[in-house]
Amino acid sequence: MSKVTVVGAGNVGATCANVLAVKKVASEVVLIDIKEGVAEGKAMDIMQTAQLLGFDTVVKGVTNDYSQTAGSDVVVITSGLPRKPGMTREELIGVNAGIVKSVANQILTYSPNAILVVVSNPMDTMAYLTYKALGLPRNRVIGMGGALDSSRFKYFLSQKLECNANEVEGFVIGGHGDTTMIPMTRFATYKGMPVSELISAEELEQVAKDTMVGGATLTGLLGTSAWMAPGAAAAAVADSIINDQKKMIPCSAYLEGEYGYNDITIGVPCIIGKNGIEKIVELPLNEAEKALFAASEEAVAKTTAVLKEIGVL
């Protein structure tokens, strides 16, 4: 019997719960939200697809009753506010830090051994906050961003190669932001062959650029942030934990000397299994990639420093 809680029944949270159910990742999924009735309604809607889609996962929606989340193996935290017009970055970080910190504390009260997957934005900063505020072992706090960015990278590669995205391997490291992520074009492969052998350097560079603005492109088309791929990416991380798949998934992890950095939570390739982050994979970066990673780390550290400036940490 396995149990996953998804905090926040917005588009991303509900999609995550739906994917977890349809893929039969866990025997029970709890969807919890602060707004009366929303989680219950979305859970009921998901459950009414069980016969149509052939799953037996029980999805339960609750309003702000964290006792219902007791015994969760994995908790996905999607709660937080989007940035509103006129709101400063510091104000947004302050508001979301308060929400994430409160949620994480309540979760641990009822599920002291849970592994936490952080989706709330700014994601690298919220993962850092969760790790620092709760004092958990670093393997138990995972930022989801790289899983999503890497999926988008593989999508754009597959479009350029005119193939199925499942035939492509590729990943993104660095911060979860359109100026801080680093699509690792040098390591991208199609059926084991370097993609750089199949398309031009200019085409590969365009794929990287498309990946970096992938989120913004969708926001422009949808009029709001995307939710299908983000929800599925969070579910994929939870799946690798629950079923001990030991997949290599780029995630935001707290570094203790890896890549030459300390006291930063940033996207790196991780082996994800039943213990959460079981290993951080250190890639042999060339000088250009090291420079990009250094710039990304500096930008993420600057955002993360706001937590101390506003007194949250």
Predicted region positions:
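N-terminal Rossmann-fold NAD(P) dinucleotide-binding loop
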Residues: G13-A14
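Glycine-rich Rossmann-fold phosphate-binding loop(s) that bind the pyrophosphate
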Residues: A9-G10
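C-terminal substrate-binding/catalytic lobe of Rossmann-fold NAD(P)-dependent dehydrogenases
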Residues: L134-R140, D149-L313
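Rossmann-like NAD(P)(H) cofactor-binding subdomain of soluble oxidoreductases
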Residues: T88-K154
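Rossmann-like NAD(P)-binding element
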Residues: L52-A114
